[in-house]
Each structure stands twice: as C-alpha cells, then as structure tokens.
Amino acid sequence: MANLERNKQTVIAFITRAFNDKLPADAVAQYVGSQYIQHDPQSPDGAEAFVQFATGFAGQFPQLHIDIKRVIAEGDLVVAHLLITMMPEDRGMAGVEIFRLQDSKIVEHWNVLQPVPEQAANDNTMF
C-alpha cells in the first residue's frame, strides 16, 4: 500500500513541477527513470524529448495550469484525471494521463485529451 501512495505522490509532483512550476528538466531529473517510453502520438520517446516538448509548450502557453482532480494507483500504474487550462478564462481540456513506474520512477506514459464543451447533454461536469 505504501508503494502505491508513493507512486501517486511521484506523479503529482512530476505534473506539478513540469507544468505548473514550468521546470520540466527538474521534474525529469527527480521523477523520470533512465528510459521514458511515450505513447502520446505528438511526443517522441525519451526524457530529453519530454523536456524539449514541455519547455516549448510552456513558452507557447505561459499561463498553462493543470488542476489534478483525482489520482488512482494500481500495481505499477498511476492514472491522473486532470483539468488543463492554457489561460485563466479557458474552459480547458479534460485529460487522463497514465504513467507506469518502475522503482518509484516514471518510465512510460499514455494520455487521452478532450476539450471541455461549452454545453453538455447532461448536468454533470467532466470532473
């Protein structure tokens, strides 16, 4: 049980450091393993590629903020449900990020993103 909680805290810290604090190189140094496998079709494999991507993204969207709504862990996987906004007035995007950890380090990543619509077919939120 302690390992699951540690993995959740690792993912929370990684997302916060890389995107909200705008320090992706620091996040990679602290929380990513020597191999980083990327399944996002817009991002290449490798820790250095992630740093370049996140640095460019932060430059393009300096007000980017990720609100972590929930984090779930099972085995070596951690799933984070996120609200991602590019600027404060933005409705944002709902994100589901899946991380695989090995020895308390992030080694693999998948994600699915969906814009938050102006109107929904129900009265529920995406969060």
Regions found by a protein language model. Give the residues of each.
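C-terminal and inter-domain tail/linker signature
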Residues: 1-127
